[in-house]
């Protein structure tokens, strides 16, 4: 009888142990996973051995980029905060876009794209072909680009007009060097840095097309002798010649 009871007790113990096995295995798996996560987030795990910064720029200093990168390299391949570095680099006024890429097992590749302004906007800002306005240090603003100006929130309209007028003038080798929109909605532009064109507030497309049509016939090679052209008349235009 005692032997029978001992067998039953042993059998119960084995069943209890078997029931615990899945729990123990799950616990071991969790501990292993936790240890792996801790290891991956350890800054000493797979630290970067090579950092490559690529930038084609006249206004972004490599030394400034390196300072920001060094400040944000606080982790290894897995723990490194790429988003924080990208945000920091994007805060530089001349930076248009930033790409941060990790290359296994210990390389970091950073590509920085510079803003490409096509004109100056109002006083101390620049505008890109996509209509993005940014404010770089005044001393870095190029002096040989067109000047666009207009009221707040008019930059898209002014930029579209600038591109439209510039395209129409290509056959005549004339360039729009300034374009202005007043608060009252009046348009004027300057060609080749010296000849002013007044378009007024109404029928802008019609008036400019009239100017383009008459340009080779009346102005053409004499553009340097023209002070201004006034297209604000319902029938015709007025030309002021230089003395």
Curated annotation (Swiss-Prot):
<dbReference type="GO" id="GO:0005886">
    <property type="term" value="C:plasma membrane"/>
</dbReference>
<dbReference type="InterPro" id="IPR045335">
    <property type="entry name" value="FtsQ_C_sf"/>
</dbReference>
<dbReference type="InterPro" id="IPR005548">
    <property type="entry name" value="Cell_div_FtsQ/DivIB_C"/>
</dbReference>
<keyword id="KW-1003">Cell membrane</keyword>
<keyword id="KW-0997">Cell inner membrane</keyword>
<feature type="domain" description="POTRA">
    <location>
        <begin position="46"/>
        <end position="115"/>
    </location>
</feature>
<dbReference type="Pfam" id="PF08478">
    <property type="entry name" value="POTRA_1"/>
</dbReference>
<feature type="topological domain" description="Cytoplasmic">
    <location>
        <begin position="1"/>
        <end position="19"/>
    </location>
</feature>
<keyword id="KW-0131">Cell cycle</keyword>
<keyword id="KW-0132">Cell division</keyword>
<dbReference type="InterPro" id="IPR013685">
    <property type="entry name" value="POTRA_FtsQ_type"/>
</dbReference>
<dbReference type="GO" id="GO:0032153">
    <property type="term" value="C:cell division site"/>
</dbReference>
<comment type="function">
    <text>Essential cell division protein. May link together the upstream cell division proteins, which are predominantly cytoplasmic, with the downstream cell division proteins, which are predominantly periplasmic. May control correct divisome assembly.</text>
</comment>
<keyword id="KW-0472">Membrane</keyword>
<dbReference type="Pfam" id="PF03799">
    <property type="entry name" value="FtsQ_DivIB_C"/>
</dbReference>
<dbReference type="InterPro" id="IPR026579">
    <property type="entry name" value="FtsQ"/>
</dbReference>
<dbReference type="GO" id="GO:0043093">
    <property type="term" value="P:FtsZ-dependent cytokinesis"/>
</dbReference>
<feature type="topological domain" description="Periplasmic">
    <location>
        <begin position="41"/>
        <end position="243"/>
    </location>
</feature>
<protein>
    <recommendedName>
        <fullName>Cell division protein FtsQ</fullName>
    </recommendedName>
</protein>
<comment type="subunit">
    <text>Part of a complex composed of FtsB, FtsL and FtsQ.</text>
</comment>
<dbReference type="GO" id="GO:1990587">
    <property type="term" value="C:FtsQBL complex"/>
</dbReference>
<dbReference type="GO" id="GO:0000917">
    <property type="term" value="P:division septum assembly"/>
</dbReference>
<comment type="similarity">
    <text>Belongs to the FtsQ/DivIB family. FtsQ subfamily.</text>
</comment>
<keyword id="KW-1133">Transmembrane helix</keyword>
<keyword id="KW-0812">Transmembrane</keyword>
<feature type="transmembrane region" description="Helical">
    <location>
        <begin position="20"/>
        <end position="40"/>
    </location>
</feature>
<dbReference type="InterPro" id="IPR034746">
    <property type="entry name" value="POTRA"/>
</dbReference>
